[in-house]
Amino acid sequence: MTTSTRGAAKVPAVLVLEDGRTFRGRAYGAVGVTFGEAVFSTGMTGYQETLTDPSYHRQVVVMTAPHVGNTGVNDEDPESKRIWVSGYVVRDPARVPSNWRSRRSLDEELRHQGVVGISGIDTRALTRHLRESGAMRVGIFSGSALPDEGTMLAEVRQAPEMKGANLAAEVATKETYVVPAIGAKRFTVAAVDLGIKGMTPHRMAERGIEVHVLPATATAEDVYAVNPDGVFFSNGPGDPATADGPVAVMREVLARKTPLFGICFGNQILGRALGFGTYKLKYGHRGINQPVQDRTTGKVEVTAHNHGFAVDAPLDQVSDTPYGRAEVSHVCLNDNVVEGLQLLDQPAFSVQYHPEAAAGPHDAAYLFDRFVSLMEGQRA
C-alpha cells in the first residue's frame, strides 16, 4: 500500500474489483493505492469501532449507510491502537463533524493513519454486486496512482486472497499484558489474543476478572502458567483453517476441562478442535443488526457480527466429539449459519458474534455472565 496524506477532497479515485467492475469517485482519507478483500458492513453507527477492529485486517470495508463521519473521531472509542482496515468506501462523508467528544474529522484520521479511501460512489450498487457475486479482491487507486484500467485490474488480481490467509499473529499482541479486575478480583482468565478488541477484556474486568492477554502464538504451557480459572479465545482475521497452533492449545484446554469461552474466530477454533470443518461464506456477516436465535431458549437477539468464515456443524443433532457431546447453540436467522457451539459434558461454549457490543446492541452481554457461572461451578 502506498499513500500520501495530502488533502484528498477533489482528487479522482477509482475502485476496481477483481471481476473487472469499476466505480469512479473522489479520494477520501489518504491518497494512493491499496488492496484487500471487498466486504460490506450494514451498521449505521459505530464506524470508529469498525475501523479499529483487528478482524478487518486486509479488508476494504464498504459502508452501506450513506452518511458516514457525522460524529467525527474521538479518543475513547477505538478498539485497538490503530485503524486496521486496508481501505474504506463511503458514499457521502460528513463535511463537518458534530459531537461534543469529537477531536478531529474522520477524513483527517484516515489521512493521519495512511488509510486510502474513496467516496462519492454508488455504495448501494457496490453492495448489491458483492452480495450477488461474493466478497472479492479489490483495489482503490487515487492521485498519481491512476494507471489504465487494465493495469489496475492486473494489480488487483495479483493481491493475496483471504482464503488460506494466516493473519492472527499479524494483529495480536507480541507480549503478554494484564487487564486488572475492576473492584475485587474474583477470577483469573487467560485470553489468547487472535485479534482481540479492547472492550472484550474490559467486559470481563467489569465482572471481577483479571485478564492475562497472551499472544496468538501462546502455547498450552503459556496459558496454564498464569494459573487460570478460565480460558478465552478472541476474535481475529484470516482463515481459521490455517490456525493449527490455537486449535492445538484449545484441545489441551478441553482435555483439562477448564472453563472455556470463545468469540468469533474463537468459535471457529472451537469448531475445528471438536472435529468440525470451516468454510468461507459468500459475502459474510458484518454489521450491528444481525438476528440470531438461541436454540435452547428460542430467544432472538440482535447482535454485532464481523465474520467471513463459519463452522460446518450439523444443526439438528447432538454430535459426539473427542471431548464429549456438542451441539449448535445459536443460528443466524437470515441464513441458518452456525453462530454458537456448546459442549454438554464440560464447561465450554462459544459464539460467532460479538457480545462485547463495541459497537452494537447489548442483547448478548449475558454470555460473559455465563462464563463467570462456569468458573463458579468449577470451583464449587
Swiss-Prot record:
List UniProt keywords, sorted A-Z: Amino-acid biosynthesis, Arginine biosynthesis, ATP-binding, Glutamine amidotransferase, Ligase, Nucleotide-binding, Pyrimidine biosynthesis
The entry's L-glutamine-binding residues are S55, G236, G238, F265, Q268, N306, G308, F309
Glutamine amidotransferase type-1 domain location is 188-380
Q: Which residues form a coiled coil?
A: none
Its pathway, per UniProt, is:
Amino-acid biosynthesis; L-arginine biosynthesis; carbamoyl phosphate from bicarbonate: step 1/1; Pyrimidine metabolism; UMP biosynthesis via de novo pathway; (S)-dihydroorotate from bicarbonate: step 1/3
What CDD domains does the record point to? GATase1_CPSase
**Root EC class:** ligase
Query: What's a BP term from Gene Ontology annotated to this protein?
Result: L-arginine biosynthetic process
CPSase: region residues: 1-187
**EC?**
6.3.5.5
Q: Tell me the PANTHER family matching this sequence.
A: CARBAMOYL-PHOSPHATE SYNTHASE SMALL CHAIN, MULTIFUNCTIONAL TRYPTOPHAN BIOSYNTHESIS PROTEIN-RELATED
Identify the HAMAP family for this entry: CPSase_S_chain
The task this protein performs is described as: Small subunit of the glutamine-dependent carbamoyl phosphate synthetase (CPSase). CPSase catalyzes the formation of carbamoyl phosphate from the ammonia moiety of glutamine, carbonate, and phosphate donated by ATP, constituting the first step of 2 biosynthetic pathways, one leading to arginine and/or urea and the other to pyrimidine nucleotides. The small subunit (glutamine amidotransferase) binds and cleaves glutamine to supply the large subunit with the substrate ammonia.
Q: How does it assemble?
A: Composed of two chains; the small (or glutamine) chain promotes the hydrolysis of glutamine to ammonia, which is used by the large (or ammonia) chain to synthesize carbamoyl phosphate. Tetramer of heterodimers (alpha,beta)4.
Designated name of the protein: Carbamoyl phosphate synthase small chain
Q: What species was this sequence derived from? A: Streptomyces avermitilis (strain ATCC 31267 / DSM 46492 / JCM 5070 / NBRC 14893 / NCIMB 12804 / NRRL 8165 / MA-4680)
Gene for this protein? carA
